[in-house]
């Protein structure tokens, strides 16, 4: 079992929430940005916990303010099917979680939504990214194969 806790307090410049306090959708980032490897990120107050045991990964990623894109999990399995359960709670700003494999967006999970889905595994790596624009957000995930 691997358990990681981290706390990050950094001073940084953030992307302004230009679509208002009641709209949590991304206003600045487009799909090509997500696939283009824009991974620079400004984060404040990050608390992360995760565990991987055999064919299962679980975790929580909580940040008081994030602007940019950060990878929160990478999962690989030799099983035929992988099941993802991802919950995104955004209190401020804009946020989106994307699952990417082989430079393709597999799923998008919008702010304040929960989604369970399965993928047919092709022995690829599946990466979960959090994208935020001045977002206060918590992501919880459970992956099983």
Give each language-model segment a name:
Residues 95, 132-145:
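Edge beta-strands of jelly-roll/beta-sandwich modules across compartments, strongly enriched
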Residues 7-11:
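C-terminal motif of bacterial Sec signal peptides marking the signal peptidase cleavage site
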Residues 80-90:
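A short beta-strand element within beta-rich, extracytoplasmic domains
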Residues 16-74:
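Transition segment at domain starts
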Residues 126-131:
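Short, aromatic- and glycine-rich surface loops/edge beta-strands on solvent-exposed regions
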Residues 63-65, 71-82, 117-123:
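Extracellular and analogous surface-interaction loops
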Residues 91-106:
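Short, surface-exposed beta-strand/strand-loop-strand elements in extracellular ectodomains
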Residues 109-115:
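Short, solvent-exposed loop/turn segments in extracellular or other extracytoplasmic domains
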């Amino acid at each position: 079992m691997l358990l990681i806790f981290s706390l990050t307090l950094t001073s940084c410049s953030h992307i302004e929430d230009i679509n208002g306090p009641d709209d949590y959708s991304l206003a600045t980032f487009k799909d090509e940005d997500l696939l283009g490897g824009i991974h620079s990120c400004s984060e404040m107050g990050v608390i992360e916990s995760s565990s991987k045991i055999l064919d299962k990964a679980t975790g929580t990623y909580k940040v008081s303010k994030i602007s940019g894109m950060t990878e929160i999990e990478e999962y690989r399995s030799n099983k035929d099917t992988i099941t993802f359960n991802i919950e995104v709670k955004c209190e401020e700003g804009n946020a989106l979680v994307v699952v990417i494999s082989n430079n393709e967006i597999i799923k998008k999970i919008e702010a304040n939504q929960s989604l369970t889905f399965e993928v047919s595994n092709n022995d690829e790596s599946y990466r979960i990214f959090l994208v935020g624009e001045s977002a206060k957000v918590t992501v919880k995930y459970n992956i099983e194969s």
